[in-house]
Every structure is written in structure tokens, then in C-alpha cells.
Amino acid sequence: MLRRLVGSEMCIRDSRNSDPSDIAVTAAGGLVGEVVQIWRPRELNTHETEWGFSCMSYEISGALGIKMANPDKEVIAFIGDGSYLLYNSDIYSSVITDTKLIIIVCDNGGHAVINRLQLFKGGKEFNCLFESSNTKKLVGVNFAKHAESMGAKSEEVSSIEELEEAFKRAKKSKVTYVISIKTHSYQWLEGSAYWESPTLELPKTKENKEALKLHKDCLLYTSDAADDALRV
């Protein structure tokens, strides 16, 4: 069985193989945290992350606008399969306007970062991953062929080594190039910060009690750290 990659592995390799002027774009899901920690900008204005409202699918349309403003630079959009399925028609826009993009689709089987948040907060999986949702027939999407149907060049890869070679081909391409790769649904980048979002009060399961304790401990730590900073 194919080992599903963690998104950070992919970001590391793409960052290493990019040029200093390349612009990385991301917006929603786990990729925001992973790209911010892993991608290494070497010039000003080469990293665009949509924070605030976690605007799903901004990745492609945002990358299109950035490329229009920077026609001589490579623009690389990192997007999850969930965001891709919500809105992807600007791939077609990029093709018909001759506005070349590189798009990396990380296929982790749904809205995996919210599924991880559900579990992290003491809950259970609920309608985030396609395989654990109320589906009658699970159909895998071929993102490479879908992008190809809109005029882009595309390929699906299954390893970091294949990704590196595909990325080189994408850089040489004159038209929008989409690379699809399967990534892990549950594993996450090790280094991270606490995500302060509400924790379930009910039901009083073992997982829920542990999540509540962690939430309160982190809030107390944050409050004490803020007080210490004010006293300095």
C-alpha cells in the first residue's frame, strides 16, 4: 500500500527546488500551518497566505491574480482536495488567458484538518473525511485528469522523488501544471502551536476530559505568559 506523505514533506522538497523569486500561495486547511513553517522565502513578497477567514479555494484564484501582477515569476499554489473540489474553475481561466500556474493538490481524503480538530477537541469523526462520512458509494477523484480536461498539463505522483521530478517539469511548462499527490489524513507536522478553539463540554468521555484539561492548561499558560510580558 502506498505510504501517504505528510504535507510538510512535500513543502520541504518544493521549497528546496524552487527559485528565490517563486511565489508560494496557500489559504486553508492544514497546508497553511505547514507551508508557513516549512517554506523558506528568500526574497520579499514571495509568500502569500490568506489568514483570517481561512478562505477555501482562494489558493487558485489568488494565485491567478498574483501571477497577473507578477507575470515573470513562477506562482505555486498549494491546495487540499477539499478546497479544490469547492472551486477550481480558475484553472480554466489561467489556461485561456495564458497565465501559467503551478498547482499542487494534496489529496488527503476530504477536509482532514477539521477532522483532526474534531478528534483533538475530544469529539468523534463527523462528515469531514469522505470515507467516514455518510456516503453510499465512495468515488475517488482523479484530480490530474480533471485539471487536464480544463486544458492544463497534469500528472499524479506517488512519492517524494516523483514529486521532485514532476516539479521540475512543471517549472519548464509554458501552461498551467497541476500535480496531484496523496497525503496523510491523520498525521501532522510535529512542531506546532495550540489551536485555541472551543472544546466540547459533553459528552464526558475520556477523550473529552483530556481535551478539556489541555484547553484549560493552555489558556492558563497563555494568560501567565501575557502577564509576565507585561511585567517586563
What positions do the PLM features span?
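Single conserved hydrophobic/aromatic residue that forms the stacking wall/gate
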Residues: 1-12, 221-232
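Generic structural signal for beta-strand residues in well-ordered domains
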Residues: 3-4, 16-17, 40, 68
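Acidic active-site catalytic centers that drive phospho-/nucleotidyl reactions
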Residues: 7, 27, 81, 180, ...
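Active-site pocket-lining segments that scaffold enzyme catalytic pockets across diverse folds
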Residues: 8-9, 13-30
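Intrinsic-disorder/low-complexity regions
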Residues: 16, 21, 207, 226-227
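Thiamine diphosphate
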Residues: 34, 38-223
